[in-house]
């Protein structure tokens, strides 16, 4: 994602390059922000009998943000507050921006800390390839798409064993069916790298049918996806997704509960006196309670703390949701 941040004016100029960039723009935009960009809308000049579709540059005050992960769609709805001088009758009307890769959008932040904005931009700027992880054993294969957003398990493929075959031929049809799916995903998602992970013998056999970097680990299938993410192979990904911080949280819950704050009230209290060293916050909570969330995060940055924004639809996200949407590791 290409971007320029004017901290003084609180303006971010963004050009999304990949579909996953839309998620980070979704995190950036809140109700009340001003979003500007080129768009096309129906326009009927005064005296004209019929309207026509006209390209124009607009600014809207944001009222609603709609992000659909599986459709890779981001729509921003609001009221027009800025428009080209020669265009009349548009200001005050409602408009929807469709934000897509390759099209510039300008966001003027009206609330929250610039440090939080910078954190979101840093997350978006992580140089990670698009990885298709094929986690496989002799019973199941799981295909997971790994990007700066984390891991999305796209397909699970059970091995439909043909009892009439023996030895390696028992797995041949299974490997071929998995490879067919792999080639389809590579085409649709523009994959940079395929990683084949699982028990050594299975990975060696599968590698004759599925081309990719081989990683030996104890498990395949869905369990193997999570084993892969916990491994040291993609430490930068683990850091950005908050997996390292969450691992520390789990250890401290077991041994030093007084150095952990769980839920909004505990975290607020800790943040107010500068105790919060690291905060993990759910992306959905930031959208459900934006004023509350931005106030907490601003205080965290003002006291030198770190923030990790975690997707709810991940293993860590589900745990944080159960703990009250936000957790903190404390200094003392």
Swiss-Prot record:
Name of the featured protein: Protein pelota homolog
Cellular component terms per the entry's GO annotation: cytoplasm
Cell location: Cytoplasm
Subunit structure, as described in the record: Monomer.
Cofactor field: a divalent metal cation
Primary localization class, coarse: cytoplasm
Entries under SUPFAM superfamilies matching the protein: Dom34/Pelota N-terminal domain-like, L30e-like, Translational machinery components
Family (UniProt): Belongs to the eukaryotic release factor 1 family. Pelota subfamily.
GO biological process terms, semicolon-separated: nonfunctional rRNA decay; nuclear-transcribed mRNA catabolic process, no-go decay; nuclear-transcribed mRNA catabolic process, non-stop decay; ribosome disassembly; RNA surveillance
InterPro entries in UniProt: eFR1_2_sf (IPR042226), eRF1_1_Pelota (IPR005140), eRF1_3 (IPR005142), Pelota/DOM34_N (IPR038069), Pelota_arc (IPR023521), Ribosomal_eL30-like_sf (IPR029064), Transl-rel_pelota (IPR004405)
Top-level EC class as recorded in UniProt: hydrolase
GO terms assigned for molecular function: endonuclease activity; metal ion binding
